[in-house]
């Protein structure tokens, strides 16, 4: 297995494009992913009870298990838009299906942007009419789905599976309202692997728990969170079967794609200057370790301390104590590989030296609870003045 350069359309049988539909002032805002043959589709969605119209539609598509295309607009979330919003999402499906001679129920729709605003359907229709099946425009898709993001987020891997080279590509957006429990977070993954839809869904659901569900920027879960994975079988590999060595390799590749995308989202949190990676080990079990890791990385006090390069490890210990349901009297804690706590007792360290290390753009926090073999990670970012500025003026 190796990481390669590519786009969301690098796996065989996929195409992608994007246009400026004038939903934004000047940037690309309407993107398409198209499989040239029917593809198995898996998905995981927001747990927010107020979910967007596209989420309702896509849940049904994933339930049926097959799709040909994904269309995604930015700038307008099409959430809390009532019956008209749902009708607009269905209309978007229909327009794209007619354009590329597909069935409407084969088209997944996604939206991201401001909540409570209706889609401008004339602009959507005009934009769809401009989408094409050109092979040279796939890289544009990653730009079209952005909102407050400062950069595109992509990843590509390939591996030999079932006697063939299998490609997997991922693209995502997300910068604010990131606290998935599955933020706004959208992620799209394509692969030319041959694998049954039920196994595809099972695998994605498992991997989501240790990747996308372990990132947080601001503690808010979006109405639109969506992860979609399409597998069209065009690599012509022997079908991947659960429990086989091919399956383990496929699952590892999907985990790498999802973790890379999740970390890219965390690093690009609104106003962020640093990626924070928290590793908790020695917990009673993995689930507890992941829960504690996410609590630490989501703490506003921890996030602001990291922004200020302040080695205030007490805030980390406080976060652990708030959620631990077991005895925590033997904690070992490291910041940037510097030991600050051993057997729950403070260790002398050079605060000025550690403060300098906390100015780096990736911060690593490792907590060993010495209470079991559970291991978990979570990712987030620092909390800055810029975050407040961005969100105070978001709809202005």
From Swiss-Prot:
SUPFAM superfamilies recorded: DmpA/ArgJ-like
Pfam families xrefs: ArgJ
EC number: 2.3.1.35, 2.3.1.1
Keywords: Acyltransferase, Amino-acid biosynthesis, Arginine biosynthesis, Autocatalytic cleavage, Cytoplasm, Multifunctional enzyme, Transferase
Site (Cleavage): 183-184
Major enzyme class: transferase
Membrane spanning residue stretches: none
Positions of the record's site feature: Involved in the stabilization of negative charge on the oxyanion by the formation of the oxyanion hole: 112-113
Catalytic machinery residues: 184 (nucleophile)
Catalytic activity: N(2)-acetyl-L-ornithine + L-glutamate = N-acetyl-L-glutamate + L-ornithine; L-glutamate + acetyl-CoA = N-acetyl-L-glutamate + CoA + H(+)
Keyword Transferase: yes
Residue positions binding substrate: 147, 173, 184, 270, 391, 396
InterPro entries, per the entry: Arg_biosynth_ArgJ, ArgJ-like_dom_sf, ArgJ_beta_C
Single GO biological process annotation from the record: ornithine biosynthetic process
GO cellular component terms listed in the entry, alphabetical order: cytoplasm
A molecular function GO annotation: glutamate N-acetyltransferase activity
Acyltransferase recorded as keyword: yes
Pathway annotation from the record: Amino-acid biosynthesis; L-arginine biosynthesis; L-ornithine and N-acetyl-L-glutamate from L-glutamate and N(2)-acetyl-L-ornithine (cyclic): step 1/1; Amino-acid biosynthesis; L-arginine biosynthesis; N(2)-acetyl-L-ornithine from L-glutamate: step 1/4
Chief localization: cytoplasm
Subunit composition and interactions: Heterotetramer of two alpha and two beta chains.
Role description: Catalyzes two activities which are involved in the cyclic version of arginine biosynthesis: the synthesis of N-acetylglutamate from glutamate and acetyl-CoA as the acetyl donor, and of ornithine by transacetylation between N(2)-acetylornithine and glutamate.
Protein family: Belongs to the ArgJ family.
Name of this protein: Arginine biosynthesis bifunctional protein ArgJ
